[in-house]
């Protein structure tokens, strides 16, 4: 979930409030809590791609410290003023997301007049103007993002948020009326804070020897979450026992913005979790999904008699047993690689192999004496696949393209006409970038399977 700084990468419908008071108050707070900002950087709305950001006052070299945040200044379930009660009752706060303790900490601190983090909250985006698709009208979300996987992800989020709020959060607030004012007892506010945590929180990575532990709880990191995102980022967050340090990893010329990144995120993930998409072709981490059940559907289209259909379902059940496929899984295709290489190669192989060969393969529980080159599957390998594999993959791509409301040419026409594109709403532009990036990957697969 949340791992690195989260902020819109491209200019959106943010407010144009240039009031210097929040920044001055925040900088004074930084001094009080020991948050060390390099004199070479400035917090500003000027010269940034979206909202508040950080800009280089002077040239910065790789390895230079941009700022250091002492752990005491982090806002988490462990540092907030109600940490004691959150710890005592942590058993009742268990949830699927794992975010409830932090969200309760935020609900308490944001309504407390004397909260130590008040100057930090002043730099938060306006909660009522968050651009996540969960805040779009359902009809608009489905119309603009049909086929991308986002509407389905949002629906799951909304169900989980509602359940979490009424079964865990509200009962906790009702049990502690002295800690939570009536104005923060709102499902809508809770949804907004979930989106904020999704987009702005950090999650400290586990050490190698801790791999089997539960993931660390999310936390809010003042200053670090001011940075905007760019795939080709020029700064990186480092964790140490006493503080979190943002360090330059590329030369940053004077006047240029400082960017963090939050990993390899496809555009559909960006818009779902953070409310923006990178314009094509900037997002080199973009992907397109082919639902696993779509490949099964494509294979079923090639069956002619009941016996063939029954055998195909037997093959599918065997793939499920091998944990190569699942009813809700997807094969993930990037611009230059198949991210689910083993799963896709094995699925094409099992669904396309002759019946006798499948029987032998099944008897060996999917083990073979020799792993063939066919078991690897890269983008460049696709034209070399067996004809039956290519055909099944092609049919699956065609079925996937049918799930979108528009075709690639429609998207290209919108993107190629600057006046028409500029006239689109912010949401229409972001959704278009998501759809177009996915369709470009899928159409390349059509070329490779021709």
UniProtKB/Swiss-Prot annotation:
Substrate binds at residues 99, 201, 203. One of its GO terms (biological process) is stem cell population maintenance. It catalyses: L-lysyl-[protein] + S-adenosyl-L-methionine = N(6)-methyl-L-lysyl-[protein] + S-adenosyl-L-homocysteine + H(+); L-lysyl(8)-[histone H2AZ] + S-adenosyl-L-methionine = N(6)-methyl-L-lysyl(8)-[histone H2AZ] + S-adenosyl-L-homocysteine + H(+). It is found in: Nucleus. It comes from the Eukaryota. Keywords: Methylation, Methyltransferase, Nucleus, S-adenosyl-L-methionine, Transferase. One of its GO terms (molecular function) is protein-lysine N-methyltransferase activity. Monomer, homodimer and homotrimer; these structures are stabilized in the presence of S-adenosyl-L-methionine (SAM). Protein-lysine N-methyltransferase. Monomethylates 'Lys-310' of the RELA subunit of NF-kappa-B complex, leading to down-regulation of NF-kappa-B transcription factor activity. Monomethylates 'Lys-8' of H2AZ (H2AZK8me1). Required for the maintenance of embryonic stem cell self-renewal. Methylates PAK4. Belongs to the class V-like SAM-binding methyltransferase superfamily. Histone-lysine methyltransferase family. SETD6 subfamily. This is N-lysine methyltransferase SETD6. It comes from Bos taurus (Bovine). The gene is SETD6.
